[in-house]
């Protein structure tokens, strides 16, 4: 069976991405990261998602000394959602470069054909490492800088959500039976999602767009009157 490394944070997007890889017939090798993020609950979610798919191995990589972000530095406040067009303080320096590099090394070892990453350039927070040009550049690195690449057996970087809105992503998750009830998206990392941070707001807007009820609990839920049937467990 063909193998794929899946970058699994425990959030909505990475879990949907996992469902896409599963449906495509890949043997799944999820990779999660503890980089000192304040929302440690996502690691619990990632474990639950991996168990749901009965994967052979779920690896957790610890990366120390990652800073300069509201997600890793308690002295920087996580802001509520804004649309000012600026790169927000929740940007983690070089995060996807680090994650993909680890996934690439792991992928070469296990003989993976693909690496799945759940990034989107549509409904996203403005992070530069979530854009198509970033993925194209990293694929070039894979092609010219690895044994697999130069021998003609390159590892494909797949981002199936890249051009999907959050609502379209949620619809895809529902179609694939993705376990979104296990996921968390909140940057603040409380027992309940805050409902007002950038990530929560995009998630709630997506469920509203999809006409599907979000299966997780929020402190501030906003107007959810347009939601209909919840995703099934």
From Swiss-Prot:
Catalyzes the ATP-dependent conversion of 7-carboxy-7-deazaguanine (CDG) to 7-cyano-7-deazaguanine (preQ(0)). Belongs to the QueC family. GO terms for biological process: queuosine biosynthetic process. This is 7-cyano-7-deazaguanine synthase. Its EC number is 6.3.4.20. It catalyses: 7-carboxy-7-deazaguanine + NH4(+) + ATP = 7-cyano-7-deazaguanine + ADP + phosphate + H2O + H(+). The keyword Glycosyltransferase does not apply.
